[in-house]
Amino acid sequence: MTATEQQLALIKQSIKSVPDYPKPGILFRDVTSLLENSRAYAASIALLADRFRDAGLTKIVGTEARGFLFGTPVALALGLGFVPVRKPGKLPRETISENYVLEYGTDGLEIHKDAIVPGDKVLVVDDLLATGGTICATVKLIRRLGGEVQDAAFVINLAYLGGETLLNSIGVASYSLVLFPGH
C-alpha cells in the first residue's frame, strides 16, 4: 500500500457513519470525527492541497460552515487567500446573493462583492458533495463576479446523490478523497 493509499484509508476510517440521522433511513457520514483525528485531518488537507498545487489558482472559496474547516487550511497550504460563502445576512460588507432549491424549500448564499475579481482562478472546497445544490450556487456567485471555477474539491462524495453529475453539467470537475457509493 502506497503512502497516499494509507492516508486515504486513514481518512475513510476516521469518518463515522451514524444511522437514522437526521431522520430515519438516512446514514449520515460524520466528518467531525475526522476533525477529531489530527493525523486524518492533516492528511486530508495535504492531499487536497497537493492535488491543486500547480493549478494556477488565485483563491480558495469555502461554503458555510464545514467548507471553512477544509478550505482555509488548504488555502494556507497553497499560499492563497480564502473567501467564505455564507448564509444571508452574515457578511458585513456589500454582498451578492444566490438562492438554491433544497428538498423542502429554498435557501440562499452570499459572498462579498469585492472578494473575487475578474480573472481569479478559484477552487471551491467543501467537506461533502451530496446533491450539489450548495456548490452550484457557490459557483454561480463566483462566476457572477468574474471568477473562473473549473474544479471543486471535497473530502467526501456521496455519489448516489448525483452531485458530481450536476457539477459536470455546469463545467465543474469534482475531486473527492473518499467515495461512498451507496447508503
From Swiss-Prot:
Which pathway features in its UniProt record?
Purine metabolism; AMP biosynthesis via salvage pathway; AMP from adenine: step 1/1
Tell me where it resides: Cytoplasm
Q: Which InterPro entries does UniProt cross-reference here?
A: Ade_phspho_trans, Adenine_PRTase, PRibTrfase_dom, PRTase-like
One term under GO cellular component? cytosol
Identify a single GO molecular function assigned to this protein.
Answer: adenine phosphoribosyltransferase activity
* Enzyme Commission code: 2.4.2.7
Q: Which UniProt keywords apply?
A: Cytoplasm, Glycosyltransferase, Purine salvage, Transferase
Biological process (GO) annotations? adenine salvage; AMP salvage; purine ribonucleoside salvage
For this protein, what reaction is catalysed? AMP + diphosphate = 5-phospho-alpha-D-ribose 1-diphosphate + adenine
State the top-level EC class.
Answer: transferase
Pfam families named in the record: Pribosyltran (PF00156)
Q: Where is the signal peptide?
A: none
Q: What's this chain's function? A: Catalyzes a salvage reaction resulting in the formation of AMP, that is energically less costly than de novo synthesis.
Q: What family name appears in the similarity comment?
A: Belongs to the purine/pyrimidine phosphoribosyltransferase family.
Q: How does it assemble?
A: Homodimer.
NCBIfam families listed in its UniProt record: apt, PRK02304.1-1, PRK02304.1-3, PRK02304.1-5
| Protein name per the record | Adenine phosphoribosyltransferase
Q: Which organism is it from?
A: Sodalis glossinidius (strain morsitans)
